[in-house]
Amino acid sequence: MDLSSLRPAAGAVKNKKRVGRGQGSGNGTTAGKGNKGQQARSGYQKPINEGGQVPVYRRLPKFGFTSLQRKPIKTLNLSQLEDWIQDGLITGEEISVYDLKALCSGSYADYFKILGNGEITTAIKITAHFFSKSAEEKIIKAGGQVIKAYRTLEEASKIRDLSVEEALLKPKAKLVKRVKKSAKP
């Protein structure tokens, strides 16, 4: 088997439907638009106007918003970590953010949260950004250690004074809002 012998799966690639190319094609003459009239002409769009009825976009209320500061968080259960340990994907007692990023291949997330679903039998030292209470308790009960990271890998790599491992664990500085003192009378 080599690269030249690879083919897409059956049914994965469809031919483009070419309309208006003769009656024998099945999509000729009217090109799938039916017979004459406004809907068969170019520029036709389905109307939003619903007559005197209140349109659907006004009937339904506005709901919520999308936060621009949202942190994409990848959640992992203890059962998943235990499976990785049993399969030999995790070797040793220490699991870093690098390991989590590598094991969750294709993950868009910058932050990792460990959840307490399942059991863990191995004593591990794990570094992640967030832990649920139950996950933290189960890891410590198994003889492990929980370390909270404060930064993403990208942020940590930009700090020049520290190694990436040290920078991950360094808390971010908090912005302190200063109150202006009133002018003296």
Swiss-Prot record:
<protein>
    <recommendedName>
        <fullName>Large ribosomal subunit protein uL15</fullName>
    </recommendedName>
</protein>
<dbReference type="GO" id="GO:0003735">
    <property type="term" value="F:structural constituent of ribosome"/>
</dbReference>
<comment type="function">
    <text>Binds to the 23S rRNA.</text>
</comment>
<dbReference type="GO" id="GO:0022625">
    <property type="term" value="C:cytosolic large ribosomal subunit"/>
</dbReference>
<keyword id="KW-0687">Ribonucleoprotein</keyword>
<dbReference type="InterPro" id="IPR005749">
    <property type="entry name" value="Ribosomal_uL15_bac-type"/>
</dbReference>
<dbReference type="Pfam" id="PF00828">
    <property type="entry name" value="Ribosomal_L27A"/>
</dbReference>
<dbReference type="GO" id="GO:0006412">
    <property type="term" value="P:translation"/>
</dbReference>
<keyword id="KW-0694">RNA-binding</keyword>
<dbReference type="InterPro" id="IPR036227">
    <property type="entry name" value="Ribosomal_uL15/eL18_sf"/>
</dbReference>
<dbReference type="InterPro" id="IPR030878">
    <property type="entry name" value="Ribosomal_uL15"/>
</dbReference>
<dbReference type="GO" id="GO:0019843">
    <property type="term" value="F:rRNA binding"/>
</dbReference>
<keyword id="KW-0699">rRNA-binding</keyword>
<keyword id="KW-0689">Ribosomal protein</keyword>
<dbReference type="InterPro" id="IPR001196">
    <property type="entry name" value="Ribosomal_uL15_CS"/>
</dbReference>
<comment type="subunit">
    <text>Part of the 50S ribosomal subunit.</text>
</comment>
<comment type="similarity">
    <text>Belongs to the universal ribosomal protein uL15 family.</text>
</comment>
<feature type="region of interest" description="Disordered">
    <location>
        <begin position="1"/>
        <end position="51"/>
    </location>
</feature>
<dbReference type="InterPro" id="IPR021131">
    <property type="entry name" value="Ribosomal_uL15/eL18"/>
</dbReference>
<feature type="compositionally biased region" description="Gly residues">
    <location>
        <begin position="21"/>
        <end position="35"/>
    </location>
</feature>
